[in-house]
Amino acid sequence: IVLILSGAMGKNAAENAFKSKVFSLPVQLRWGECDPAGIIFYPTYFQWFDAAAWNMFAEVGYHAKRMRAEHLAMPLVSADCRFLYPAQQGDHCAVRSRITHFGGKSFVLAHEVLREDGMPLAKGSETRVWGRFEEGPGSRMRGQAIPEELKARFRAV
């Protein structure tokens, strides 16, 4: 089942909306990801968002090994999270992610963390830039236009 969710930014929401496939990454809250109260330590959500972003790209054929070999990058330039309900050690969750906007050289991802019983735990977003390292990973990176072929891989059918 492919869900179609759309989102947008700014005044031209209808123009900028992108109907994306929704990707799901299963995660489990482990002891080392909790604070002393036994609930999720807030940076864990950001780690899960990052893992979900890389998982999405791997699922459409842009896995980390390929991106590194082709000198491609998608650095994070902005991230936010709304904490709705605390996860507890051992909770099984899913990070549901989609792309809500493609700009010329940047894109926005929306993430939602759901506990296995469907309880929403957190919602967040990331803005990333599409780029290429000039001389390989670790060298200077420049933003690049996002290929239409890549956008098509994320588009909901």
Indicate where each model-derived feature is located.
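Residues that recognize and position ribonucleotide moieties
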Residues: 38-39, 47, 72-74, 119, ...
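Catalytic strand-loop segment that frames the active site of acyl-thioester-processing enzymes
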Residues: 10-59
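Hydrophobic residues in beta-strands and at strand termini
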Residues: 27-31, 83, 130
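Hydrophobic beta-strand-centered segment that forms part of the acyl-chain substrate-binding groove
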Residues: 56-102, 106-107, 121-123
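Short loop/turn motifs enriched for small/polar and acidic residues
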Residues: 32, 77, 114
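HotDog/MaoC-like acyl-thioester-processing domains
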Residues: 10-19, 25, 88-92, 100-157
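Residue-level signal for pocket-adjacent positions within structured domains
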Residues: 29, 35, 62, 69, ...
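N-terminal amphipathic/basic-hydrophobic helices that include classical n-h-c signal peptides
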Residues: 1-9
